[in-house]
């Protein structure tokens, strides 16, 4: 979502996301991924229209805080449930929290929902340093928690704010080595 969304009506926001999605379909993208959303009511009509137009896979990912709520007050459980019960092809959570809090949230949710689940936490929590938001480098701790997240059943794992190509490379290496074993 864009910061200017706050000044638009629901119908205006839906209309803009439909235009963006249709443009992506017309360009021939393989997947349309709406990420870091605090609510699903904006996306549901967008997804319906896009799926009726072409069968481009659509992923939706929500941003929640360490308590499991979006900045619009929706719980992670409610957001994921709404998306699972729609035409969305893949659901998930990204941003908002570091890997520890993401893992704690996922332990309270049933992510075995019949659709692929994507989980991409931030590298941690940024600190304001010299007029910039900076994330501490903690790849080992991040990878350790990502392994636990994958073991809970996440189908797609990665990183959001504060991660970089080296984090993703280390996730890939961890998967290749077989360090990730899904829970039974």
Task: Place the predicted regions along the sequence by residue.
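Domain-level signal for soluble alpha/beta catalytic cores
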Residues: 1-184
